[in-house]
Structure formats: structure tokens, C-alpha cells
Amino acid sequence: MANGEAFDDAARLARQTPSLDVGCHLVLIGGWAVAPPHARLPESAPALVRALAGRRIAVYEELAAQVRKILAAGIHPTHLDTHKHTHLAPPVLEAVARVAAEFDIRWVRKPFDIPLTAAGGGATALKRATSGSLRLLRGRFERVLARHGCRTTDHFAGFQMTGRFRTRELVRLIGALPDGITELMCHPGYLGGDLRRAHTRLKESREHELEALLAAETRAALTAAGVELVNYRMLA
């Protein structure tokens, strides 16, 4: 996140770990704009929709500025996605695709959860309904990316598991993955003081996700299913 409070530290760590696959998490909700005049960004999805409708936000200029900031820090992103999946909105998607093409970033996230993300149950009815509704946008989404020469994965998983990501759910998901390339969205981390004070609901769950990703059961499930772990750089 180019407008994130810990950007400088994250960029330093990325430079120290050149094998790390780093993407750009484009932000149009929350925080301050990177592009002049560095105004406050909308605080919610409804506020962003109103800003888009009123043409009060220069989407392309802001997203391009965020990518330029990352490039200036010595990092070339391998992929793009957006905070809160805002590129599901047509004007944002167009801007993201333009930015990807301009800066030679080949991959863009396709955030349409595969139904089996809810393997074993547990996803809220709202998340299941939202995920199902979003899939109706998939055709147009893929056409826009193709028109700009962008690539995306065959499948995506993780939306319905957000906040309830545990070893059991991950093992079930791995065993039910379809053929092709699947991006797994996750939010692993350590619950330190900064995270406790952060404005996010994903706090304790980050340690649960980290535990699931490192679990022996997860490794065994990957082996049993014949799943190969890759990153975007390996797919370029």
C-alpha cells in the first residue's frame, strides 16, 4: 500500500529480500492520496461510489501515482489488486488495467471467489450472497483485462474465508481446488501493538491464518492434492 503508514519499512524489507514477490495493493478507500493535492481518500465504499459519480476523484492519476511511488522505492510490482476490491467498479477497473499496461505489470487480481471457498460451511450468508452476486460481473471484468493485455488467474479463493481462516478450512479448500492457477487471498501476521491500534477488524485472525499456512496438515494436503505453490514472478 503506497499510502500505508508503514510503507517505508515495507519497502526496505522488500529490497532486502529480492526473491520476494511483491504486488501493489492499490488504495482508493482510507488514508491520504499519493497524487497531489494529497487529499483525504473516501472512507468507505459508498463514499467512493459517490465520489466516482460526482467525478470528485481522479482515479487513474491516483493509482498511477501509487505505482510510481513503489517503483521509486526500487520495487517493480509483479501484480496489482485493490483494497476492498474496488476494481470491481467499472471506472476503477478501467484505470487499474490502464496502469497495469502502462507500467508493464502483467497480472491483475480477479476477485471472484470460487464456490468451494466455503468448503465445510462457516461463511456468513451475506458473504455467500455477495460472492455469488459478484460472479455475475466476471465476464465483463475479464474482457476489460484482455483488452488491455492483462493476465489473471483461473480462480480466486479467500473472500468467504476472511476472518475465519483456520487450518481445517484451508485443508478442505486445498482438497477441492479445480485445475488451473488459483490465487489464495490471506492476511497472515503477528498481533503486535501497532496492529492492535489499527483500524481493522482483522487482528487475532492474522495469527490464526499464519498458523494455518505453516501447519504440517496444510503441507500434507498440498502434497496429497498435487498442488504446486507458485508466485506471480514464476508465472510471468
Whereabouts are the PLM-identified features?
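Terminal accessory/targeting
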Residues: 1-79, 90-236
